[in-house]
Amino acid sequence: MRLKPFALTALALVAAAGFGREGNAETLFESGAKWSYYRGNDHPSGGDLEWAEPDFDDSDWPSGDTPIRYGDGNGGTVLADMRNTYSTVFFRRTFNVAKAAQVSALDLLVNYDDGFMVWINGEPVLDVGGSADLSHDSFASVGHESGNFETFALANPSQYLVDGENLIAVMGFNINLTSSDFMMDAELRSYRPDKSPPKVASIDPPPG
C-alpha cells in the first residue's frame, strides 16, 4: 500500500465567504427609492449637523423618488429651480437592519453629479468631492459627471449601525451655480460572514 503524505494532498474547499461578498448581500434600500430632501436656499439646521441626526424633524421636507436631479438623467424628481439659485441639496431617509452587529461590510452605490458627503446615524462615513465648508452655499471640490453607479465601501459598519431603524443623510454639492446638471441616486447593500462550513469540491491527487 502506497502512502500519500498529507503535504502532497490538496483539498479544494469552496466557501462563499472566501470568494467575495455576493453570497450574503442584502439590499437595504434600492436606487430609485424615495428620499426626503431640502433645497439649499438656506441651511436646514442653522449651520450645524443636527439635520444629519436620526432625531431631527424633517416632516416638513418634501419627498421624491430618486434620481433627484436636473439636466442629466431621466425620471425621478426634477429640481427645476436649482440652476442659478442654490448649490446644495440635503437628503434623508431611513432603512432597517436586523442584528446590526453581524454586518461586516457596507457598500453604497451612487450615481452623482458633482460631489456628496454621507452620514449614518449622525456619524460621517464618506466624502466624495464634498466641501470642507458645509454651509448651504458651498460647492463641490471637484466636478464629476453622472451616468453610472459607482461603489464606495463604508468602513466599520458595526460602529454606527443599530438594530432596527437607521438614518442615512447625504449632502449633495454642485460645482457652481451655473452648472448645467445635478444628480443624486443611491443604493445601500450590507454583507454578513457566511457561517456555513466549507465543502470539499475535489481532492488532488484522487484517493486510491
Model-derived features with residue positions:
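N-terminal secretory signal peptides that target proteins for export/translocation
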Residues: 1-6
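An acidic-aromatic loop/edge-strand motif
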Residues: 131, 141-197
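Short hydrophobic beta-strand segments in globular cytosolic domains
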Residues: 125-126
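Proline-centered linker/hinge motifs at extracellular inter-domain junctions
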Residues: 198-199, 206
